[in-house]
Amino acid sequence: MKKLLIIGITVIMFFFNNQATADYEKVFFDFKIDSIGGEKIDFQDYKNKVVLLVNTASYCGFTKQYDDLQKLWDQYKKDGLIVLGIPSNSFNQEKNNNNEVKEFCEVNFSINFPMSVITDVKGDDAHEIFKWAKKNYGKSAVPKWNFYKILINKEGKIEDTFSSLTNPTSNKIVSKIEKLLQI
């Protein structure tokens, strides 16, 4: 019985291990992505910053979270927070092209935080940043739906992930951001 208990605890610890302390071969800052405006976003530019990476979509029930993502950006960008939106059609709820997404975000939500081009976030065609996240943090870093959030610390490692149900301005997210920003 004791042996079974030890095996059970070991299995549980394996599945709930905090991968944020994993020995990363690469960190977040080693990647790049195309911006929705046509430039290249080099994550090296975000070194020593805290990044909230969010896969977004225009036709989702969570699309209203754009407002709160913009509020986070406005409130904490001076302290070193980067909100990075990654529009995705991985869940079949995004517009047809980047110009439509850009216009939608600017007109409806006055978005001015960095946004990438429409990007796959899961499966074999996922952008390398999402493959990196899965490799280093496990399945909990794979977006389950639109507006899934991955919090990256100043060292370029995954600190935490948050479901689509977790509002960007929730105490759960804001307290982690403030802790990482040391404010």
Segments predicted by a language model, with ranges:
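Terminal helix/beta-alpha structural elements that buttress the NAD(P)+-binding lobe
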Residues: 29-30, 117, 131, 153
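Positively charged n-region of N-terminal signal peptides that target proteins for export
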Residues: 1-4
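Structural microenvironment flanking redox-active thiols in thiol-disulfide oxidoreductases
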Residues: 62-127
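Short pre-active-site segment immediately N-terminal to redox-active cysteine/selenocysteine motifs
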Residues: 49, 55-59, 87-90, 155
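Bacterial N-terminal signal peptides
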Residues: 7-15
